[in-house]
């Protein structure tokens, strides 16, 4: 049912040690053969590459997995469920503008009923047919409603509220990024690996652990925010329902 990968660090790093095994989960070592995508940021600008072909067979993905160096990235391998066919417009990650920033989103799970929810305006209109992209647009609409002064506690609390509402419709693990902060929500299946050594401070997020090491599962319904490889906020899980700014 799709898999997620996210990365945040305090300096540019080559991501091959994680992206290479993640690529194999795109139809090779896991049943996610219906497309892949990688978003990364360079000098504040998002670059997005994706294809509807199986990731483990893709030469383009092999090059990206080997060569990509960045401080911030989101990747996805897809198992087509809703709609149950591959296609470029339905391949994650998705990118839309909100609050004068470009946001990138990828999702693991199924929340098909979200497609029927009414939207409040044209802020974000899906390009494809997936429940994932519809959910993304609803999240961005909520963020915009609380983003007037760009105070993180306000829009993050609104994001958490909408996340919990959408999660009642099914399974809703996701990664979201505005080019500065990596937001990860573990509804029921997400892991993190946090590292701080001579090579820098970094966090790797993945649906399943990709390497040996002290990977830790997210608590159920836990939302975390990372910046420069450091966790700066946490909601849900075993914490209070209001933002815990670290």
Can you describe what each PLM-predicted range is?
Residues 191-223:
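A conserved acidic, glycine/proline-rich C-terminal tail/linker
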Residues 113-115, 120-146:
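Glycine-rich phosphate-binding loop plus the immediately following alpha-helix
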Residues 2, 103-113:
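Conserved beta-strand-loop-short alpha-helix elements that form
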Residues 6-9, 40-42, 76-78, 107-108, ...:
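Short, structured patches in soluble enzyme cores that scaffold and shape functional sites
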Residues 72, 148-187:
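Catalytic core of PPM/PP2C metal-dependent serine/threonine phosphatase domains
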Residues 15, 48, 83-85, 113-116, ...:
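Short helix/loop capping segments that flank catalytic or ligand/cofactor-binding pockets
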Residues 52-63, 77-100, 117-121:
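Short acidic (Asp/Glu) patches
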């Amino acid at each position: 049912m799709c898999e997620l990968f996210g990365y945040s660090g305090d300096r540019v790093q080559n991501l091959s040690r994680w992206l290479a095994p993640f690529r194999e989960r795109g139809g090779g070592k896991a049943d996610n053969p219906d497309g892949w995508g990688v978003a990364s940021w360079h000098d504040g600008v998002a670059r997005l590459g994706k294809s509807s072909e199986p990731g483990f067979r893709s030469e383009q993905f092999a090059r990206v997995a080997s060569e990509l160096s960045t401080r911030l990235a989101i990747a996805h391998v897809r198992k087509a469920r809703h709609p149950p066919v591959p296609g470029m417009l339905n391949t994650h990650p998705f990118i839309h503008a909100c609050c004068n920033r470009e946001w990138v989103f990828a999702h693991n799970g199924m929340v098909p009923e979200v497609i029927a929810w009414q939207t409040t305006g044209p802020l974000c209109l899906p390009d494809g047919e997936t429940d994932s992209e519809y959910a993304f647009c609803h999240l961005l609409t909520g963020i915009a409603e609380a983003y007037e002064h760009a105070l993180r506690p306000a829009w993050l609390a609104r994001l958490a509220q909408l996340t919990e509402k959408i999660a009642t419709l099914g399974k809703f693990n996701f990664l979201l990024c505005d080019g500065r902060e990596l937001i990860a929500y573990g509804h029921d299946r997400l892991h993190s690996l946090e590292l701080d050594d001579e090579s820098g401070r970094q966090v790797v997020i993945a649906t399943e652990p990709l390497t040996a090491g002290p990977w830790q599962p997210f608590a159920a319904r836990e939302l975390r925010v990372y910046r420069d490889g450091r966790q700066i906020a946490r909601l849900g899980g075993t914490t209070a329902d209001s933002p815990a700014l670290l």
